[in-house]
Amino acid sequence: FCFQGEKNDSHDFVYDAMKGGASALVVEKKIDIDFPQVISSSSRKMMSEIAEIFYDFPSREITTVGVTGTNGKTTTVNILSAIAEAAGQKPKTIGTLTGQLTTPEAPDLQRQIRDSVGSGASFLAMEVSSHALLQHRISGMAYDAAIFTNLSLDHLDYHGDMESYYKAKSLLFSPSHAKLAVINA
């Protein structure tokens, strides 16, 4: 999967992918090489959707809650996990305490959810960063509920302004992502 990152463009590394055994490339712009390519307007979104299909839509097999906001995601996820456990559920959490990224890249995320379902987890609470929302890491995810903790001045180096930051966070609350929304007033 080739896409433009913040610092690098993975289209520049297609020969490494080919040497590594890739049988095709998903690209956002045609590359002048004799190699199978699928051109997508968003390779990241396609990667997320393919990961969901590859892992057989694991978020549909577990009660899933996504938590977003500037602050309080980790605390909220841990409280939800404790409540689920007290209610007799087997919880799993995904976030800053369990990984390097607040929200893992789509293939890693889908694998973690599939592994959780396979090990008997019945409840998933996960942190969902604004970066992950804009980078389509959760495209196709089925959340039973989405929680918004707050929005304050942060990550403006990435988003540019508060309106863009707000719009990124609000993506989690679209009907295609969440059945229920909980907004901290």
Walk through the language-model features, giving the residues of each.
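Phosphate-binding loop of NTP-binding sites
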Residues: 47-185
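N-terminal leader/targeting and accessory segments in enzymes
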Residues: 1-49
